[in-house]
Amino acid sequence: MSDISKASLPKAIFLMGPTASGKTALAIELRKILPVELISVDSALIYKGMDIGTAKPNVEELLAAPHRLLDIRDPSQAYSAADFRRDALAEMADITAAGRIPLLVGGTMLYFKALLEGLSPLPSADPEVRARIEQQAAEQGWESLHRQLQEVDPVAAARIHPNDPQRLSRALEVFFISGKTLTELTQTSGDALPYQVHQFAIAPASRELLHQRIEQRFHQMLASGFEAEVRALFARGDLHTDLPSIRCVGYRQMWSYLEGEISYDEMVYRGVCATRQLAKRQITWLRGWEGVHWLDSEKPEQARDEVLQVVGAIAG
């Protein structure tokens, strides 16, 4: 698409970044100044009843800056990148029709990628193939299957943990059904996003600062009642660790504690470590992202001003 064609497209803003980087605070600040409406891009914030452990914006924040695509699924339900793209495009069209600008904020990089580039069609699940994979896992262990994935699709294997059976199984299933790797298929773009997008990433300049913020926030969540929140989910009886909701960072570790698998101190340690690993993966995604403008979260006023400088012309 030519620059002239792009300039004629409606405008949108992406505000991306690792967990605990200050994305929400900046987005709320920007809404006070720019004619924007916020759309959440977060695979955990979609779930109802999962507020503390996901650092969901609180009532006051949502009154100041309503977020779309929050609380749209029960924790028992699945939600795919394709679901997100469909829903986000509908919300973006609604915002644009009202004469405002969509500001998409979050840290689920796969959702941003799906929205920006489109999705290639993946083969539907095959119960027979899935059963064969699960049988092999029962006999040889998921570590063995992870090594198998590493041989055929090292890129996906680097992204998928051996202790993530659902994603590991799906990656192998796609290969067995189609003969093509998940990486090959997901790199085949579908329909590109019909918007002129200004992309920003916010993070502390120092990784150590981000690690400190992650640890502080995890302890703040615990002090705010995170354990009680997960106990309520645990008590439902219909939720389990094969669900994407319960595999969310923090929830998986608290679940293990409630099941008596680990001590409280071990839960805290694992929760902090898992959150740091998530942040590392998010930053790795962003380092390879094209056309992104980096912001320093330790200088919030400067970050705000940089966004305004880049996108200020579109606010008129």
Curated annotation (Swiss-Prot):
It comes from Escherichia coli O127:H6 (strain E2348/69 / EPEC). The keyword DNA repair does not apply. Its cofactor is Mg(2+). It holds the Pfam family IPPT. Its EC number is 2.5.1.75. Substrate binds at T19, A20, S21, G22, K23, T24. Belongs to the IPP transferase family. This is tRNA dimethylallyltransferase. The gene is miaA. Monomer. GO terms for biological process: tRNA modification. It comes from the Bacteria. Keywords: ATP-binding, Magnesium, Nucleotide-binding, Transferase, tRNA processing. ATP binds at G17, P18, T19, A20, S21, G22, K23, T24. PANTHER family: TRNA DIMETHYLALLYLTRANSFERASE. Residues 42-45, 166-170, 247-252, 280-287 are annotated as: Interaction with substrate tRNA.
